[in-house]
């Protein structure tokens, strides 16, 4: 469905890459008494646009979601790896360590 929408009517005349930046809560929340450790978000692919980047925060985490149809990116990890490398370059230019903080997921692997 996403691939079909991305190809329908050619290129979108209004936009071709939606990017959303959503600041999240700065303190951990609870749902039914359970501590919320992570929040996941993703934006939709729209007609004529085969790529969506969504960025959001939760407490001390910065999260990035990349959604793509197969004709735009065969492997979305190519884009996310490039983002990580660019982020490391920015950290180094700012005089910070290139080592990124890894947050262990609470979800079962």
Language model regions located:
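Acyl-CoA-dependent O-acyltransferases
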Residues: 1-109
